[in-house]
C-alpha cells in the first residue's frame, strides 16, 4: 500500500475521473463535493482515520465527486480489493469502523430515496373511482 502527500488545496481526484483507488486519511482533512449546474454541493469533510473513494474498488465507474485537501494530508492509497482485504485484516478496529460507516451511508441513502419516493408518489398515482 502506498502513501501520498497532498498539500492543502490539492486535488486527490476529480468528479468524472476513472481510477480504482480508495483513500484512508492518515493526517490532515479532505473535503468531498460535487458540482451540478455550477453549484457546489459539499458531501462531507473527512479527517484522520476516515476513508473515501471506496466505491471505486468495487465499481468501474467514473468518480461521482471531487476530493480536495483542506489541510496538508498524508493518505494511504488502497488500489485493489486484495490490498483492502489485507489492510482490514491488519487493522480490525478500522474494519469495524468501516462497516459502521458504510451501514450509516446506506441508511442515509435509503432515507433519502424513501423521502423522494413519498414526495413524488402522489403525482403518479391513479385512483380507481368508487361506485
Which residues are covered by each model-predicted region?
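Regulatory nucleotide-sensing modules
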Residues: 1-33
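Short, mixed charged/polar active-site loops
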Residues: 40-42
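Short, electropositive, low-hydrophobicity segments enriched in small/polar residues
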Residues: 13, 20, 32, 53, ...
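Solvent-exposed strand-loop boundary residues in beta-sheet-rich modules
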Residues: 36-38
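Helix-rich terminal scaffold detector
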Residues: 123-127, 131
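A small-molecule sensor/coupling module
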Residues: 83-123
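Cyclic-nucleotide recognition modules
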Residues: 11, 44-98
